[in-house]
């Protein structure tokens, strides 16, 4: 009777499941903390009554909420960034059989920065015109994107991708990720002109799409030449 083939198992501590669960938890907590730091109306003069008319209360509350515009913008931007990084992380771990030591090590700064992001988000939300606030937020996000990119790069180099994964397509995604990270870190030079640097940050998705099309076009050209 023929013996069944032995399935190769990941080395102890290198299985992706526990890292994925822990990463999901850290990102979920970080994304929740983002909204907690947005200032809330607490003064009694936001309520009609006690000498405050309904019209006055509405006006005061509206002005208070409008004054928090930079905080809401920072919240949406940071939430979107965390969601993108988490989504790419999810896609990566659907394509690997195990984790290399380098990939595990890179999760320390990745999760450290993800958990830290609510702090610079709060600072930039309160002081959007301060270059120090813009500089800190740019560094935190840039570091987070760099860690994500390096994890993807190590997955490709360390031979942990599943057999059916298109290596060329995966390499293209890594290249795009490097370009986006470089673009974000390049906005450090614009930090002095805060809050105008916010415009550059909102263009990140557009830069990613342009880079993706350029990389794909170049890969197809190389195929034709080969």
Task: Name every feature range the model reports, one short phrase each.
Residues 2-226:
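Multi-pass alpha-helical transmembrane bundle typical of ion/small-solute transporters
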């Amino acid at each position: 009777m023929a013996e069944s083939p032995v399935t190769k198992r990941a080395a102890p501590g290198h299985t992706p499941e526990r890292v994925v669960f822990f990463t999901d938890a850290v990102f979920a907590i970080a994304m929740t903390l983002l909204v907690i730091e947005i200032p809330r109306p607490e003064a009694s003069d936001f309520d009609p009554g006690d000498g405050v008319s309904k019209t006055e209360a509405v006006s005061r509350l509206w002005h208070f909420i409008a004054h928090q515009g930079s905080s809401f913008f920072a919240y949406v931007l940071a939430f979107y960034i965390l969601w993108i990084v988490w989504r790419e992380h999810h896609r990566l771990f659907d394509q690997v059989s195990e984790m290399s030591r380098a990939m595990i090590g890179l999760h320390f700064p990745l999760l450290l920065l993800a958990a830290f992001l609510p702090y610079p988000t709060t600072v930039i939300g309160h002081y959007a015109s301060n270059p120090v606030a813009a500089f800190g937020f740019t560094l935190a996000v840039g570091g987070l994107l760099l860690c994500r990119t390096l994890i993807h790069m190590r997955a490709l180099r360390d031979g942990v991708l599943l057999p059916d994964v298109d290596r060329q397509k995966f390499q293209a995604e890594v290249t795009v990720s490097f370009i986006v990270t470089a673009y974000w870190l390049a906005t450090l030079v614009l930090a002095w002109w805060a809050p105008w640097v916010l415009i550059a940050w909102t263009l990140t998705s557009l830069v990613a799409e342009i880079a993706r099309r350029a990389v794909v076009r170049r890969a197809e050209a190389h195929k034709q030449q080969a």
